[in-house]
Amino acid sequence: MKYYTTNALYEQIISRRIPHYKFTTGNSWQLIYGDKNSTPLLLVYAKGVNETEYFSDYSQQDQKAIGLLSFVSKHSSLPLLIIRFRADLNEIKEVLVSENSLDFKRVSLAQLSDIFKKYDLPVSNTPTDKYLNDKSSSAYHNWQRSCLGRGITVSDIDLWKVDSKGIPRVIFELKRSYYTIERWRPFPEDYNNFKLVWSLCYKSNMLFKIAYNVRTKNPFFDDISRIKIFSVDFTKNPSIAEETVFSINDFMNY
């Protein structure tokens, strides 16, 4: 089963072959887990695969995605897990987990909860025998919502900017809605997630920015002709400040 795979900005990066922007799509996620105070505790590269990929070597896409997470893992002193789950099944009872980026072990979903608990993440007592892959969410994400409880913050990494040596320098959170470029501001209810990503960037000597573009539903149009940039720094007041509005060409060259 395939989930959210792309957006207009990703498609432009691909079509223009922009080398300094990196991202994962399809059934792959680069995740940051933290406590209720938005303190990062764990990094995860999670991927839904089919039967033939389940025990296969890392793909080139995997290697690049894990490489970026490994960099911030090293510089932030945060552990990194790699998790594979079957996305071609209606339900899953196990996953593959690697805690060293090399060797996978099969674990039940109850054991997966224990692994997360080992890294000081709160785990609920919800039964964890099996979880469904459905049209709106993967079995892994359904497990996450059910078993990690409300005392966590979690965010996926939308977009990286790397330098000429491939070292990550900026993480972007991509936001889209029907609000005009001039009107939109980050919503207060998202601040905990913003703080989580910023904290990871701060530990890793990177910048964190929010990139916003207008997207309408009726008719559907993902308008990336203009992209509004906000800088995020929770050591300052205000912690989120409007920076500039780029044309798509300027953003590609940013």
Question: Where is each model-derived feature located?
Answer:
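Short, charged, amphipathic alpha-helix that recurs within catalytic cores of restriction-modification
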Residues: 54-83, 183-203
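An interfacial alpha-helical scaffold signature
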Residues: 106, 165, 183-185
